[in-house]
Each structure stands twice: as C-alpha cells, then as structure tokens.
C-alpha cells in the first residue's frame, strides 16, 4: 500500500514541479523570435538569393551564351537559347530560370566566365501563381539594372575570397 502512495505522490507532485520549473526557465530566458517585416536578422555576405543578369557599363548585356551555367545546374532550372550576331559573337535570345526548381546552390554564378549571372541578397520575393517564379531574360536584366550598385559592391567585397 505504501508503494502505491509513493507512486501517486511522486507522479502528481514531483513531476508537476519539474515541469513547471522547466517552463519557468524558458519563460524568463531571452526570446529569439523576430517580428519579421519590421525587424530583420543579419544576412551573411555570401547569401544567395534572387538571380540577376548584369550588363557592362556601356549597356550591353554580359552573357556570351556559353551555356556553362545551364550545363552545371544540378536542378536543370536554367534554359538558354542563343544565336550568332552579324559581328560573329554569340548572344542569348532566351535566358530563363525556373525558381521553383532552383536550389540556390550558386554553381551558375561560379561557372560564369564573364560574371553575368549573379545571385543577389534579395530574399523577399514571391509569386501568387507558379508562373510568377519563372524569370525570363528581361526580368533578370531588370533585377540586375535595379540593384547593380549593391551587386557590384558585394562582388568587390567578396573578391578576395573567390
């Protein structure tokens, strides 16, 4: 009979106090929740976000249609079509990235010989439909044009580590 009393006493009181002590410890510890739109956590300098295509300072697009980024992409998210110009150089007629397939590994950025495709620090983008995350050449060039100063600064800061 004594064993039954000890069992219920320890089950009800001691275990309850242990649980409340644990709850109290977490209640008064430092909170780690961030109220996202108002507060932002620091980003790594090497964060890989939204893709962008860059241009040369004279306005010409950098991509020479070598298709290395398409070949190295493990998710097969990049589609490139190109044609020959009158001067003999190659340029892209189509450069699409399907962000629903992309795993943001950065291989496309590393393989590009002319530094055309880059991954920016932008992570706040969305799509209401699946097709909204399918970026065409014009959309990627627009992102590159809009954020060129930030992209150039990030590339310069990271140049020593490449």
Curated annotation (Swiss-Prot):
Q: Which SUPFAM superfamilies match?
A: 4Fe-4S ferredoxins
Task: Please give, as recorded in its UniProt entry, the membrane topology of this protein.
Answer: Peripheral membrane protein
Intracellular or extracellular location(s): Cell inner membrane
* InterPro entries, alphabetized: 4Fe4S_Fe-S-bd, 4Fe4S_Fe_S_CS, NADH_quinone_OxRdtase_chainI
Q: Where does [4Fe-4S] cluster 1 bind?
A: 63, 66, 69, 112
Offer an example of a GO molecular function term for this protein.
NADH:ubiquinone reductase (non-electrogenic) activity
- Cofactor(s) annotated in UniProt: [4Fe-4S] cluster
Q: Where is the 4Fe-4S ferredoxin-type domain?
A: 53-83, 93-122
The EC code for this enzyme is 7.1.1.-
- Which reaction(s) does the protein catalyse, per the Swiss-Prot or TrEMBL entry? a quinone + NADH + 5 H(+)(in) = a quinol + NAD(+) + 4 H(+)(out)
Could you say which residues bind [4Fe-4S] cluster 2 here?
A: 73, 102, 105, 108
What does the note accompanying the cofactor annotation read? Binds 2 [4Fe-4S] clusters per subunit.
What's in the GO CC field?
A: plasma membrane
The record's annotation in PROSITE patterns points to:
4FE4S_FER_1, 4FE4S_FER_2
| Main EC class the enzyme belongs to | translocase
Q: A Gene Ontology biological process annotation?
A: aerobic respiration
The entry's keywords:
4Fe-4S, Cell inner membrane, Cell membrane, Iron, Iron-sulfur, Membrane, Metal-binding, NAD, Quinone, Repeat, Translocase, Ubiquinone
Q: How does it assemble?
A: NDH-1 is composed of 14 different subunits. Subunits NuoA, H, J, K, L, M, N constitute the membrane sector of the complex.
Function per UniProt: NDH-1 shuttles electrons from NADH, via FMN and iron-sulfur (Fe-S) centers, to quinones in the respiratory chain. The immediate electron acceptor for the enzyme in this species is believed to be ubiquinone. Couples the redox reaction to proton translocation (for every two electrons transferred, four hydrogen ions are translocated across the cytoplasmic membrane), and thus conserves the redox energy in a proton gradient.
The UniProt entry's sequence similarity note says:
Belongs to the complex I 23 kDa subunit family.
Q: What is this protein called?
A: NADH-quinone oxidoreductase subunit I
The species this protein belongs to is: Herminiimonas arsenicoxydans
Recall the taxonomic lineage recorded for the source organism. Bacteria, Pseudomonadati, Pseudomonadota, Betaproteobacteria, Burkholderiales
